[in-house]
Amino acid sequence: MGVVWRATDQLLGRGVAVKELPLDETLSATDARRQRDRTLREARALAQLSHPHIIVVHDVVEDDERPYIVLELIDGPSLADRITDQGPVDAMEAARIGIDLLGALRAAHTAGVLHRDLKPANVLLENGTDRVVLTDFGIARVSGATTLTETGSFVGSPEYTAPERMSGARTGPEGDLWSLGALLCTALSGESPFRRDSLGGVLHAVVVDEIRPPAQAGPILPVVRGLLERDPDRRLDADRAERMLRAFRETGRTPESAPPGLLPPDREPPRRRAPAWREETGGRPP
């Protein structure tokens, strides 16, 4: 969704990242305008957010009607590059990354912003601090904003896209949580569990095939399985996922597989009511 350059803010004397939208001469005027508007939407979405694990937008400048987003410069690789160069991470590191991304997603969702493209390539790891930074809100959906995607088209990364969105349903924050589950699998094993040889194969894997998290996910398997629940109403929520990951980080023990409240209200076991005689006689049989 663009090319990112390392640059220098000459006025303030600081390093910045500049995201440029590649010029496509084949686009119609309408499509070119849509692409420009999408870039501006990304900047506006980021401008609403303030969180240590979300990239900071400094400015937007235009040159010959081409927008450039001036961003915080993160000196470090993407999670995708780190996996390629150094191999998968262990469960403790995956849990740390997951906790930080859950914080970022919670801040975005509270502000009415859905990322919709959470994947290893869009997560940066700062050198020296290992700070986790969520970036690239290019296809984010902002509450109250008009969608810029044409009817029937799809933008995003299928291997990390929730099944409800694949099927064309309108999605909420739960879609980003599914993406996080797939991302954790990739971080732990080096490959998405939904990778296939064709787009049709990926679609079938996400929507139909049995979901098989990698063996490396074992220590945090309940979290991964909860995030990769196909029914968004039953999917593990961000607060509980974070608590489970923090518990694992603190104790080293695998979190409980069925945390309280995971089931939606209509599926929770009914509470047993005391017999009428117990209420009327103070607990003594008549």
Indicate where each model-derived feature is located.
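Conserved short submotifs of the Hanks-type protein kinase catalytic core
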Residues: 64-78, 82
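Activation-segment/catalytic-loop signature of the eukaryotic protein kinase fold
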Residues: 60
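AlphaC helix of the eukaryotic protein kinase fold
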Residues: 22-48
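Conserved catalytic-loop aspartate of Hanks-type protein kinases
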Residues: 176
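Protein kinase catalytic-loop region centered on the HRD/HxD motif
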Residues: 101-113
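Activation segment signature within eukaryotic-like protein kinase domains
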Residues: 97-98
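Proline- and threonine-rich low-complexity intrinsically disordered cytosolic regions
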Residues: 24-29, 124, 187, 191-193, ...
